[in-house]
Regions:
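Sec-dependent signal peptide recognition
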Residues: 1-8
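Sec/Tat signal peptide C-region and signal peptidase I cleavage site
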Residues: 13-17
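Residues that define the transmembrane beta-barrel architecture of outer-membrane proteins
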Residues: 18, 47-51, 89-95, 131-137, ...
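Gram-negative (and chloroplast) outer-membrane scaffold detector with strong preference
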Residues: 20, 28-30, 34, 53-124, ...
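Surface-exposed strand-loop-strand hairpins of Gram-negative outer-membrane beta-barrel proteins
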Residues: 30-52, 132
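Extracellular loop and loop/strand-boundary signature of outer-membrane beta-barrel proteins
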Residues: 39-44, 81-87, 123-129, 167-172
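Predominantly the C-terminal beta-signal and adjacent terminal strand-loop region
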Residues: 64, 68-70, 75, 139, ...
Length: 188
């Protein structure tokens, strides 16, 4: 038992000495979160607020590698006009876990990233709710600019989700499984 604990401490100690960062990310989607089909017996109108925001932490590792964990909030909103008027507003919490690789050293560092994400829609049961929980892949690229104690990181990110969160029975409304987002992170 003592040897196992000692081995654990020796193995974990270098990881604890690595730089740690935290901050806030905000951005806008490049494509619509919901796709609305042509009007039929049931008509939908998308009215989603176009923003993504949330905190993140980054564990900086040797050789310009890092691991980033985000908690991003994205809003969804739509109206159903027939047969009875109904508005649905909800939010999705997305939790990407990303491996990042800095491509060059210096004060301006381009990077690539990839990983997985979990998502949870916080909505009451509605007819169009297909999957409250989702998972998918995340790919991205960006640039980190060092400004004193701050790091500013604009990036473009792609999310490929496994399921559609919303999908109407008649196919007039469905959430987009492929989402692209421009984000800017400010960290310490």
């Amino acid at each position: 038992m003592y040897r196992t604990f000692l081995l654990f401490v020796v193995a974990v100690a270098p990881a604890l000495a690595q730089p740690f960062g935290f901050g806030l990310k905000a951005g806008i989607p490049l494509n619509d979160a919901l796709a609305v089909g042509p009007g039929g017996a049931i008509s939908y109108v998308q009215s989603t607020h176009r923003y993504v925001v949330g905190p993140f932490v980054e564990f900086r590792l040797p050789a310009r590698f890092s691991v980033e964990i985000d908690a991003l909030y994205r809003s969804y909103s739509y109206r159903q006009s027939l047969p009875a008027a109904q508005s649905v507003s909800t939010g999705a919490w997305e939790f990407p876990v990303l491996a990042k690789k800095g491509l060059f050293g210096g004060p301006i560092q381009p990077y690539i990233e990839g990983g997985v994400a979990l998502s949870h829609l916080s909505v009451n049961d509605v007819l169009e709710l297909n999957h409250r929980n989702n998972y998918g892949i995340v790919l991205g690229a960006g640039v980190t600019v060092h400004l004193g104690l701050f790091r500013i990181s604009p990036e473009i990110r792609y999310n490929g989700w496994a399921f559609r969160g919303f999908e109407s029975p008649v196919g007039m409304l469905e959430s987009n499984r492929n989402q692209a987002t421009v984000l800017v992170g400010i960290s310490f």
